[in-house]
Amino acid sequence: AVNHKDIFPPNEKMMYMSGRALHPISINVAAKLQNEFNGKLDISFSAGADCFNLPKIIACGIKPVTVCSDLLKPGGYGRQLQYLEELAAAIRAEKADNIDSFILKFAECSCNKVEKAALLNLRRYAGAAPTNSAYHKESKTGESIKTSRALPEFDCVRAPCIGTCPAGQDIPSYMYYTAKGDYKKAYEVIMRQNPLPSVLGMVCDHQCQHKCTRANYDSSLLIREIKRFIANRNADRPNLKPEKANGKKVAIVGAGPSGLSAAYFLALEGFAVEIFETKAFAGGMVSDAIPSFRLTADAINRDVEYIKNLGVKISYDQKIDRQRFDELRRDNDYVYIAIGAQGAKKMGIPGEDAAGVIDQLVFLSDVRQERNPKIGPNVAIIGGGNSAMDAARTALRLVGDSGRVRVVYRRTRAEMPADLEEVKALLDEGIEVLELHQPLEIVVAGGKVAGMKCQKMQLGEKGPDGRRKPVPIKGAIVDVPCETVIEAIGQDVILDFIGASDLETDPVTGMTRIRNVFAGGDAVRGASTIVKAVGDGQRVALNIIAQAGKELDIGPAAIKKGMNAAQFMVKSARRVKGIKLPEIDVKLRKGFATVIRDLNEAEARKEAERCLYCNDVCNVCVSVCPNRANFTYYVRPGDYLVQKAINKKGKFRIETERTMRLTQDVQVLNIGDFCNECGNCTTFCPTAGDPYKNKPKFYLTDHSFKEEANAFRISGKVLKARVDGHEYMLEEKDDALHYHDGPMHARLHRDSFEVIAVEPRGEKPAAYSFELALKMAILYTSLKNAAFNH
């Protein structure tokens, strides 16, 4: 295939195609060959075979079937069991008793000739495979589940969906309770981190789904839709009970998602909270700019009322100028600036002030508030983000069957910043995208829009954001007929009561340069997503709570699922197809009815059951290693003291540097003798790290151990370590652990690993850290009974 990715160097013209994408091509090559030879060839097949298509391949008379790509994915060799199960189920379904009779019955052939029946099956399958959505690019969610999180030596397990969610939503836990049918518990889990479950259950951009581990198996979980199901099932739940009033007051400027989020967490902890909103309603851009076919008024009102019922006061129609801002600072202990980005960007081209040119915020607000905006039958939407998609789909519903709506974008669809889901909905509804079109001028006649001139573009070199920059094609100017132009190229924050320099915030706490004044959401980020705004509100609230000497625990819940590591691994070796996004038929999308319907109970539970609970056990690197070089071992969770020896006039005093906390019993190491450093574990590890490099690396022989600058070797009751070429040793004897380094020997307690005594050798250092000794003690104790200890 043509090298169009960033994996191989640019000078490489071609790249290797394998797996799923290759399957329809290869099965058609097999069909062509068998047609030429009347089905008499013996064909060995290896091209995207998996547990689901194996029965069809066997029915085509093709064998042996060899597998590579599928077994290099999470689940690894454990996936093979499902191959046999699916094949056995297919044979039983045909009531066949061997492969030959299966081929005959699958073909529904009365000829009783296996060779002829197999060829018939192959022709049919080859014809159907290219149109099977399982082999289309759109069926894959995202490119990788890797995140920016570092990979530590110990305690690396964290579900990538949680780490990707700006609100830190404990997704695996509410999946677990949903699958069990305990919707009350699922709701409680959601509300620990997310005060807007109804809103985010409908319109969250759900980046968590792009990092769902299931994406490497079949399809990501419908996380957002399950949240929506749980929110709806708990619509009448009584409010949480806040802590008693703590005497602290907080003023929040803006009743959008960020302000509402902060108010929720603060109210729970007993703060007196008042929100000051410029509009006559709460919700900010959520209530004013998202079309009702995506977000219902009921969902918004439900979340807002829940927060108000905690004692939060919302004052509407409030103009905040410098004087009022100073009053808020004086009358409250803390102020949170949480305004949205409510100014639409302009293109700066001729004709932009003509009648018929509308910005997307005004247009979407007019429609949402039922002000019935007047637009022409031909509408051009300029932009490629989610707001542009919303504006285009809304305009389509207004112009009717006789109108035409087109999106004008200066790059290609592949570079659009809009969510893939939103782009797909746009295309499904029949809206055309004019790619590589840069607006130059809005044609005006009689003061009104009469069309638009666009420069045709082509993609050039990549810019800092990774997208290829559009460059003009000389002389290629085209006319785009339209009577209405809706600009959707971005939004600005309009903030006149505080200076830009004062708005600079601490990236951790959210505090501005003004003491006890915080800012977050669009006010700091610029126009961004709802869930990021919610996350900012949560973060600021927690920091205000901490400043006030309080504490609110919103961390993930620890749930005992009654499964051991082996059972988690078995679950993670099975592919389970998910349900498709439950959208209503395109023919029914003429009005503003909700496009994505609610999941029913059976759908929600079935989908939630697909969760792999990778916040409990991950072991992806273990399963994807074809050489079995990544190895699972177990430690004793607990708090361990990292100690150091301080030389005081020739005598050593033991002090504690810090505490090393291990919370996870399942850990991973790498066996260097087995590892060829192929990097497959790096590809699928949800962190930014390389398991074969970052995990403790053990060697099985003294020879291989001594060849490495950084390594471990366990043999009997001795563990050796090499760090940058220097060798250390830990030995178990006399009911203790003895640590040996050149200048320092020490005796460690066998259970707590605390230093009992030190024995300096030679020149006494001023200080000596026993951090490596502690790590070696943990590793030795955990591995002394391992199979590779000899």
Predicted regions and their residues:
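Glycine/Thr-rich beta-alpha phosphate-binding loop at enzyme active sites
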Residues: A1-G39, P74-E85, R92
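Ferredoxin-type iron-sulfur electron-transfer modules and their immediate structural context
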Residues: M14, G78, Q82, R92-K244, ...
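Glycine-rich beta-to-alpha transition loops that act as phosphate-gripper elements at the mouths
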Residues: L41-L54, Q318-K319
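Flanking helices and flexible, charged tails adjoining ferredoxin-like Fe-S electron-transfer domains
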Residues: K137-S139, K146-P152, L221-I223, K227-A245, ...
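Beta1-alpha1 glycine-rich phosphate/pyrophosphate-binding loop at the start
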Residues: Q169-A179, Y187, N216, S220-R224, ...
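Conserved beta-strand-loop-beta-strand element in the redox core of flavoprotein oxidoreductases
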Residues: Q318-V335, A445-I477
